[in-house]
Amino acid sequence: MDPNNAAASSAHDLSSLDLSCLNEAERIVINSFMRGPHAHFEHLGVGPNVKWDENLSKRAFYHLVAINHATLKLLVAQARLCSMQQMNAPNLTNGASATALGSLHPFSLGNPATSVTMASNPLANGPGLRTQLMAPDFALALLGNGTTPHASAGLGALNPGLYNPSASILGGPSSSGASSVLPSPSAHTPDAATDANHLPNPDPASGRQELTRAGRPARKKMKATALDAALRTEMPNWPSVQDDFVRWTRLAWFEAGFASTISDGAIGVQTRRPFSPFLTTTFAQVGVHLPSMSPNLLRAFNSWVDMHLRSLRDHFKGRIDKPHAGKASLAARSLEDTTFVSLTEFINNMCNSYNLINSELSVAAVRALCKLYLNVRNMATAKDSEGVLRVHIRDASNRQPPNILRGTLPQDREDDDLLTLITECGAIDFDLPTDTSDTMALAVLMVMSTSATTLTLDQAGCFSSLSGAASAQVNLLTNVTCEWFSVTMVTESGTSTISLPSSTRPSAHISAHGKDFALSWPKITEGLEIDIGLTLELQHNVTLDAYELRAKVVNHRPKAKASLWQLELNLRNVRQPEDGSAFFPAGYGVRYQGAFAASGSYPSSGATMQWMAAGGGAANEGQGLYLAAHDGYGYIKFLNAAAVEDVASLSIVYLVEDAGLPFAESTMPFPLTLAVVGGGDDLWYQAAQMYRTFALGEAQWMQAGRLHQRQDIPGWYVNNSIWINSGWQCHDIFNETQGDPHTVLNVTRRIRERFNTNMALHWYEWQQGPDANASARYRFDTHYPDYLPPRGGDYFGTVVRELEKEGVHIFPYINGRIFDVASTSYAQHNGSDHCCRKANPSFGAADQSFYVESYGSGSTFHTADPTDIYWQTTLADTVDALVNTYGVEGVYIDQLAAAAPTPDWTSWHNHTKGGGFYWRTGIVDIIKAMRQRVGPTVPLVTESNSEPYMDAISGFLTLVAFEPAFVGTKALVPAFPAIYGGYFVGFGDIFNAEDLADQDPLMARVVAQFVYGAQLGWFSLGGVTSGPDVDTSCGKMGEYDLWMSESSDAIVAAVEYYGNLRVCLLEYLAHGRILAPPSLSPAPAEFMAVETAVQNAGPFPSAMSAVWLHEDEASAVIIVAGVLDAGQTYNVSVDLTFSLPSLHDRQVTVQEMSCDGLSQQLDVMPANDIQIYDVTLSDRNARVYRVHFGA
């Protein structure tokens, strides 16, 4: 029988049905059937490409067809009954009507008047299954008889609560307290009278149904039905095991119609679910919750599943325990009577015993049998073996080398048997203890295995090993790691942090395919006055080939004074050898070697992204751990990483929404993702590509598109190469002339002429305030958010327009985050109402106070709530005036992406309290408010490159990104442009006056900006250069006179050269993305700055290099850039397949290019072995080589 035809033939003629009596989920089921069987399976979450001979076995596909055939029968019957009632049809009280409806009952595949068998059903090939399953009276029991107050509701009459395992299979109370809706005797077929004593009579007065046998509940009556008779026939001891049977089937893990969960104590563990996951998946896919389904319909589903799991349940449930008195278990018989020569024979024997066809077993069933086989074999050989048998098997295609064994194997294990295990079992991975013959003590370790990562947990849920596909022999963990997840609770008594797994063993469940698992602690708060449960799920992400951890905390006593504060995943004991490294996402990214400690609040300059990595080195065969929060909405969180003596730890802390407030349930709204990645010295790059896959696919901030797709990134802005600022000092030390319009006009004109290129001016100290007296001027970091009018009044606008005519684009400074408590606006607009309040961990988060900040100016600030409408409007007013009144082309709004969020617990603020993603949405709304005033084409930029603001912010001042050294044990790596290249604009670094006196460090900073794709400069023109106010920690910033000196001619020419080269390579450096770096031989020499009163004193490399991919991914450029004015020669080696695996086995064309349009072809080379010899650099120049990938 063709399954497609079977499903299609069951659809009947539905066009005349009245579907008004069906609920939403039921109408979806019928409508999907009308579209055809494959459309229906798509609704079921199976997918449109399901075929019996591909990813589903024929047996599983028939199960789906039969289940949905039964569903359709039920729904059609309900709709037709509704149609009859609406046509004033007589009550269904005669045999003919009953027979008519009986023909529609769910399991009647043939003549309704005859007993139904499953002989024609290819699924019913288990022993003894050719027996009557359902009689018409049972169908009427499902549908209602039309004579009770509930009958008009049909299948929807019963209480839509969850199934009660202690009730009968179809029993359960109604919403009015009545028993299940059962037909009256007159609704039976002619032999119904013999069954009359089993049926309740309606009591119109009470609306309840009475029982005709004293005190016997409705579920006992059902044992006299044909269904119960079938169960008795199949299982003579059914009365004694019914409750256990029903309970077990509710716990069964159901995959495509085949049971593959094994009971606790044998080869797996159980999970508690009110309905089979098949039903959950079925209706979750169409957006319908199970409680909205008719309870009888759900129960019919589950009853059908129960019956077809029966034979499998006999096989799996408790069959590996010790023999019980009076009967021998399957496991005992296997050990005593059978010698299993190979896994194949074992599987064949099991299939023959239960009439299962080996070739049609689902993958999950094969894996389950493999696990059972190993248990049996292990018990038979345990007395002769010691240690632990560890079996690591690759994916179903066996793409990796068959490196299977680790540890001690049973002596009789044969090589051909192991190869059979690979073939039959596919991608499974598990450990079995072989040091005991006590089968009840066998505790299978939970092991999740993908083609890239194998993660092993012991019986307590502790991480015991973490290894990658490159070598199963390498364990990235130095020790077993327990207490890797913690929950921080607050009560009236104080704060408690519970770390798990600990001595409290969880209940656990492994999925059928062996790649997902769940740990549950019903109560983690022993010894406390609260009752809190925790569930952790690790699920395999197929796209990323990684594991995603999800957490759910339940408060079983919501009225108790207890609340949740934060959740933390802390992976300790990560092996980081001396030659290994770690990555932390500050700025563009920092690579650490050796001991270190780093932390950052996300989103901020200290944690611009949400991922870390650690490991690498020869001992790890280049592999490391990737840990990330794959959160596409930007929830507030905290990242921490450290390493001591070759052991690293990585942790992510999630501040929960409404932290400290009463709660019933809290689910982490994003997964924490962990995986093993390769990469060796460039471990950071491979980890970055995994994060890039997530970000491009799920992150909200990617929706604005690439640079050329955005209106707020005009062409002149992308093409800009050099930035200057009017004068800035890191400790707010300014002289009087730095922001004066007359001074700014004069010095900017001359610098523009000196560099002979367009540039952007970041203008500080432009504000005056309402008092025109110089002594009353609003100085830097005072009076925020009050700025206007500007210094010089209308003359400020005149200077702006004059400079813009000469090719200088003006970006005045404002602050978007802090509120001066001494400002006029704070006093006039109840400033405290618009500011954030912090809370110490406490129940109710009642202990609140303002965040207080102060900088070099001495003013006191509170942090404004970015979601506050007043704050958004006030900032938009200022930007409106600057653009539309004074003519600036862009505005710099400080701190938005640099400063850490200040979680807010103010009760009347319109966002979640404490945790949440409101910080991102608030800042995005600030920018939206500004754009409503100035239009979409004005660049609005801020400090630092925090990812979640990319869709709103036009560019980022990258001071923090370029703060680390470029080589050494704490070095900048361009992870951010490796992920987001082509989607953002970065500009700027801190340059000191000392850098111009010692020109090589300045040139190193400029070259770093160039090779990493940023716009150059941010040279500070004004500043205090002498006297007691000179900044001795950050260095002198006033550089104008030095730039204009003849002694700087060479360095000016070099900066101009790299600025022009950047414009020439914009299609790569701005619109493309950076790849893994090339290798230079010999390694460039390193040097330190002569002057040390600067933030980055080195070490600096004498040359830097990079590979950039074009946006169309058809070519790349290899850049080698000189820092020193002395000659240097290098050989360059590039393996493009490391970054672009699609180029494997490809030949590429390499040519040296120049910006004058001339190029010289070098050779055709393998993409994985590009060699360019004798690359000579002189006079701080660069060599550029274009690589064409070809067809």
UniProtKB/Swiss-Prot annotation:
The keyword Hydrolase applies. Its EC number is 3.2.1.-. Residues 173-221 are annotated as: Disordered. The keyword NAD does not apply. It holds the Pfam family DUF6259. Keywords: Glycosidase, Hydrolase. Residues 173-187 have a biased composition (Low complexity). GO terms for molecular function: hydrolase activity, acting on glycosyl bonds. Belongs to the glycoside hydrolase-like 3 (GHL3) family. This is Putative glycoside hydrolase 22789. The lineage of its organism: Eukaryota, Choanoflagellata, Craspedida, Salpingoecidae, Monosiga.
